């Protein structure tokens, strides 16, 4: 259930 968190982080900070 870490995919959800990773997915959100990937779309919320794509500039990093």
From Swiss-Prot:
This is Protein SP1.
């Amino acid at each position: 259930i870490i995919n959800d968190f990773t997915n959100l982080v990937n779309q919320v900070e794509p500039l990093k």
